[in-house]
Amino acid sequence: MPNTTKKRRAGLHRGFPDNPEQFARAFVTGRLAGFTKDMRICLRGIRKRVNNRWVLTHAYFPALMSCCGMLEYLTGLYVGRTNGLGRREVTAYAIKYLPQPDYNADVIRILFDAFRNALAHRGIASGVWVDRHHATRGRRLTWKVFANATRPPIEVCVNEDVLKIDPPWPCRYTHRVHIRLGRLWLDIRNSANGYMADVVACQDLQKQFFQCMEELYPR
């Protein structure tokens, strides 16, 4: 049976059937509410026993996947499509709406090439990613994920060592990427507020927003 109470509360087309600007704002606000719920659940923390002591842990990789997904979703609304989105489009959104240089082109490249794609296909927990970019001389990156909200959200640190526990042989790395999920979450959320202000004021962005709606909700 349909949830008529929820329908009444939301209203037809989020309460703005004849106001595309306010519909866009209400739509993005609704997506942000879901994103915030997911992130709060992931970062709430549970206690687990490690080496005879209790430590607080979190759902780090579901949280990271949620951040990447929301960033791509906002990018799709910004550029007018969800199909065929790539790093170039995400970088354009990031440069426009996310703090710089925290989310410059190289940071977005690492976030998506090393983490987003691996999470989508393999649900990574540990490993070493070899950076094939011509400027990095084949640096070998591993990672550590935190729940806190300090800056920078993504930081590449020189840290030469060897992974010994998970791999079947010693696996060398030269750098460690620190990912701070609380900061990533807050920055993406704040970027959406900036995007919403622009889409209400700019007809070109409204056009691209509704082009994306055509893909998400085909007539």
Feature-to-residue mapping (PLM):
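A near-ubiquitous, low-amplitude feature marking generic local secondary-structure context
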Residues: D18, Q22, R53-T57, P99, ...
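Polar/charged alpha-helical tracts
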Residues: E21-R25, T29, K207, Q211
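Short, contiguous, well-structured surface segments enriched in hydrophobic/aromatic residues
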Residues: A26, G30-K96
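Acidic, Ser/Thr/Gly/Pro-rich intrinsically disordered interaction regions
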Residues: Q100-R219
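Long, acidic, intrinsically disordered low-complexity segments
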Residues: M1-A26
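A generic alpha-helix propensity feature with a strong bias for hydrophobic helices
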Residues: T5, P20-F23, M65, E155-V156, ...
